[in-house]
Amino acid sequence: MSKVIETKQQVVTEIADKLRASKSTIVVDYRGLTVSEATELRKQLREAGVEFKVYKNSLTRRAAESAEMAELNEFLTGPNAIAFSNEDVVAPAKVLNDFAKNHEALEIKAGVIEGKLVTLDEVKAIATLPSREGLLSMLLSVLQAPIRNLALATKAVAEQKEEQGA
């Protein structure tokens, strides 16, 4: 086998592994972004723990088929970049959506969230969700509210009894 074919097979395997392992994968069209804008986008994604790479569409199609995500192939036309996140489901959608609001050249095409194909509208809906940490803090505050109210009521009763006893 030639060296070129081996290299391409390694890239296909790498992409397929990333597709399988990532919780969130977003495909974007980056045509029209300047080098400085693309660099800024990469920086923001890196800070959010998201990997952002450009692959040949033909190799990405083969990888999507081998990762059993062939429905992603219809969105692989033109210059594409793919954002992979193994940790946070919301992070790539949030960063890309915020960046796309300020830079019309960036177009979100589709994504795969936990193995399910999602459209542009679904990616935008996910982008409006708070991060995992934000959701956990909201849940914690909801769980603490009844306990806090009970403690305040108990304290008020104790203070009232002290006033009556004094």
Curated annotation (Swiss-Prot):
Q: Which GO terms describe its cellular component?
A: large ribosomal subunit
Keyword Isomerase tagged: no
Recorded GO MF terms: large ribosomal subunit rRNA binding; structural constituent of ribosome
Q: Enumerate the InterPro entries for this protein.
A: Ribosomal_uL10, Ribosomal_uL10-like_sf, Ribosomal_uL10_bac, Ribosomal_uL10_bac_type, Ribosomal_uL10_CS_bac
Gene3D superfamilies from the entry?
A: 3.30.70.1730, 6.10.250.290
Keyword vocabulary terms for this entry = Ribonucleoprotein, Ribosomal protein, RNA-binding, rRNA-binding
The record's listing under Pfam families reads: Ribosomal_L10
Top-level taxon: Bacteria
Gene Ontology BP terms:
translation
The job of this chain, per UniProt, is described as:
Forms part of the ribosomal stalk, playing a central role in the interaction of the ribosome with GTP-bound translation factors.
User: PANTHER family recorded for this chain?
Assistant: 39S RIBOSOMAL PROTEIN L10, MITOCHONDRIAL
Q: How does it assemble?
A: Part of the ribosomal stalk of the 50S ribosomal subunit. The N-terminus interacts with L11 and the large rRNA to form the base of the stalk. The C-terminus forms an elongated spine to which L12 dimers bind in a sequential fashion forming a multimeric L10(L12)X complex.
Task: Give the NCBIfam families listed for this entry.
Answer: PRK00099.1-1
Family listed: Belongs to the universal ribosomal protein uL10 family.
Would you tell me the protein name for this molecule? Answer: Large ribosomal subunit protein uL10
Q: Which organism is it from?
A: Bacillus cereus (strain G9842)
Provide the gene name from the record.
rplJ
